[in-house]
Amino acid sequence: MQYTNKYDVPIEVIRAVQNDPYTKGDGVVLSVTQLIKPPRIVALQTKHDDEISVDYRDEVFKLLGKGVHTVLENANMGDENIVPEKRLYAEIDGWKISGQTDTMSLREKLLTDYKCTSVYAVTSDKPEWEAQLNMYAWLWRKHGHQIERLRILAILRDWRRSEADKKFDYPQTPVVSIDIPLWGFIRQDEFVRMRVNIHQDAANGGELPDCTDEERWTRGSKNIRCEGNWCQVSKFCSQWQSIKEKKS
């Protein structure tokens, strides 16, 4: 991946992006966050990694999220009941996968994931959050811990007090706790295997499945994810090129 700086992002931010220590782990094929993505996007990102260009401005919110994660993780230091940020690994159908969880309460058997996100995200359906946390719970089970509750702790970066004062259906605080449905063991197992298998098919040269309307963030006639290149691979995507041709 190549970075550009078309908007004169300050050097401190550039260095922070460049010094990101993130890794999905040695020998890991895909992480949980990749597994819940559309296989078309992941396969194209892998194939065209050297050709993908991202501007530093588009990484700023990721830095904000990492900062929030660090502060909240530090708040739990010294609490022996809390397992802090931890990367877990498992093998399934020949692939090594991993997932990095934020906190797990041993006493409550509660798995919490931190999100620094928008008001819109917490007021609309986010099935990918449910999938992500249940895959994390599956990983913990593989390591001998049963999870009984799942929770998102969301920090709303665009929250406005004036909106909260006017609207009853607007989040009343910039911190929102969301309970996530916990699936049964069989459903978790089947889902993880299904996600691994469809990504294996895509990676092994099989026909790439089309992204669904939901995965393209379709709103009316707009395909927001594709049009804004939020997937980073729209110019390499035959599905998106076909959609554009039909519109023209």
Regions found by a protein language model. Name each.
Residues 114-117, 155:
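Generic beta-structure capping elements
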Residues 69-73, 133-137, 193, 197:
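Generic solvent-exposed, charged/amphipathic alpha-helical segments
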